[in-house]
Amino acid sequence: MKNCMLGMSIFVLILLLGINTKHHAETVSGEAEIPSSILETMDEAIQKELIEDPKYIALTFDDGPRKETTELLLDGLLERGAAATFFVVGEQVYCNEALLLRMQAEGHQVGNHTYSHQRLLTAEKDTIIEEIQKNNVILQNILGKEEFWLRPPYGLIDASRATLIKTPMIYWTIDPEDWKLLDAERVTNTVVNQVSDGDIILLHDFYPTSVDAALEIIDRLQSQGYIFVTVEELFRIQGVTPKAGVLYAAPDKTRPLP
């Protein structure tokens, strides 16, 4: 616990000293863009396509934070100038508070994945409220924000229970089942072969193979002109204001609820 508090104190001190760690570039309009260092590595045809018709996608990570893997992932995102969204589990936050502060400082989005990864589709309504609010309070106390978009565990919730949710809910368009495959190459190929503009990709920052896959996905898709943004940025770029209690697979695609 002492080591946990020391790490937290050091990171807070860095923030108080005003060291700006936010990394993914923004245009005048507030939209994320590929850093110039990466843009320079692309051939002229891809650069031209990117300028005329930019392609935005969102990487999302569930079930963390986990110090050993999430830290490596954040390092890789920082190096590549890529933004991501982390749907965190409240039980995982203890002793990892500094990782959440780092996520926010470096321009990532933090979302709610419930306190203990309960299956909301079958949970009692009081349990659902407790699971979401308990995690919200933890995140609010650490990050100083009020609202955290929700990803229901397993992506499952029904219409009746969705009425309890006071924020947008985020699903995905591509699920390479990284948690099951535990194979970075297969996960990478699944995503790269399926991806298109506006996709939301599901991964987990809990497994080393998933971190390896995520960074390889970024490398390969950035070379094709894709820009990695947070889910919130993706909605803003596409001009969509998400509604509370609605499950979105993408800004222009909602999931029907049972």
PLM regions and their residue ranges:
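Active-site beta->alpha N-cap acidic-glycine motif
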Residues: 30-123, 127-134, 138, 145-146
